Amino acid sequence: MWDPLVNEFPDSVHGLRCMLAIKYLQALEDTYEPSTLGHELVRDLVSVIRARNYVEATRRYHHFHSRIQGSSKTELRQPIQEPCYCPHCPRHKSKTGLGEQAHVQKAHDVQDV
């Protein structure tokens, strides 16, 4: 666990609160299996706190809030039936294009004329 007496403190009280909230959520995340809705919701809440732009944080929070309102407590620990393909999640971006860079085009052999 993060030791506040050993590590460097943030510049503001708000930064300290955010850091402590993220550390708590990371510890809470370990109590859920990686393929459950609860794990995804905790990760979404961490992304809300880490957003630097107010508009982006509000958008993420509304998305999180609608997902948490539509789920029951028993669903949080159940495996997810359908995978999430949302474009903003960094955990889903790593599944596509492993080993290939997106900006590099493949070379084609051209016959001599």
From Swiss-Prot:
> Where is the protein localized?
Host cytoplasm, Host perinuclear region
Is Coiled coil included in the keywords of this UniProt record?
A: no
| First-listed, main subcellular location of the protein, grouped into a coarse class | host cell
GO CC, any one term:
host cell perinuclear region of cytoplasm
Functionally, this protein is described as follows: Through its interaction with host SGS3, acts as a suppressor of RNA-mediated gene silencing, also known as post-transcriptional gene silencing (PTGS), a mechanism of plant viral defense that limits the accumulation of viral RNAs.
Which key words tag this protein in UniProt? Host cytoplasm, Host-virus interaction, Inhibition of host innate immune response by virus, Suppressor of RNA silencing, Viral immunoevasion
InterPro entries (alphabetical): Gemini_V2, WCCH
Extract the Pfam families matched here: Gemini_V2 (PF01524), WCCH (PF03716)
> Which residue ranges does the record annotate as region Disordered?
94-113
For biological process, the GO terms are:
negative regulation of gene silencing by regulatory ncRNA; symbiont-mediated suppression of host innate immune response
Protein name, per record: Protein AV2
Family statement = Belongs to the geminiviridae protein AV2/V2 family.
User: Keyword Coiled coil on this protein?
Assistant: no
**What interactions and quaternary structure are annotated?**
Interacts with host SGS3.
Residue ranges spanning the membrane: these are: none
Origin: domain of life:
Viruses
